[in-house]
Amino acid sequence: MAAPVTRQVSGCAGRVPSPAGSVTERGQPLAAAVAELPVLDASGRRVTFGALFRERRAVVVFVRHFLCYVCKEYVEDLAKIPKSVLREADVTLIVIGQSSYHHIEPFCKLTGYSHEIYVDPEREIYKRLGMKRGEEISSSGQSPHIKSNLLSGSLQSLWRAVTGPLFDFQGDPAQQGGTLILGPGNNIHFVHRDRNRLDHKPINSVLQLVGVQPVNFMSRPTVIHV
């Protein structure tokens, strides 16, 4: 196995190193300046990013924006992961968006998501971690988590924007997301940066990296024992 990358993730977009598709015990260091950046919870309370994974390993999913139909359907499947299997593996699941914190509660009601969720409204953490802006044209394959096509999904997003209490895009529509496995402490074990809206990491492949049994998302969520 190749030696893990150990350069600090310090905040230079496009230069943040990515480890291979395996999880190392120690990981690579996350710069303290990034860990100290704030996120906001649903009540607007500021929490340092590093506090979210200080004590245990966390799967952190950065979404594009809360109006994105792809993000909505992906988070709907994240919501199906039983809390009991995460507790058993001592893993925290966290979603981070980049809207105002006022949009957190409606988004959770819409998706049924009840795990941890925060926002980075200035996108500082997105930038420091090298998350892309704009969509790279590439074939990302068929996602197991997305049910809507481009037309129907876009119309749903537009309808939610128009009928919502605040007419906005609930974040920068050009921003892409990504998935990281972090902690305990300022250690990064896995990084995936989305190239476009459909390039998110399949959930079960991430769960496997943190020792969580795969989940059947096709019907009522159940753990697949292997």
Swiss-Prot record:
Domain of life: Eukaryota
Pfam families: AhpC-TSA_2
Region named Disordered: 1-24
Biological process according to GO: positive regulation of ERK1 and ERK2 cascade; positive regulation of glycolytic process
Role, per record: May positively regulate ERK1/2 signaling and AKT1 activation leading to HIF1A up-regulation with an increased expression of glycolysis genes and enhanced glycolysis.
Family: Belongs to the peroxiredoxin-like PRXL2 family. PRXL2C subfamily.
Name of the featured protein: Peroxiredoxin-like 2C
Organism: Mus musculus
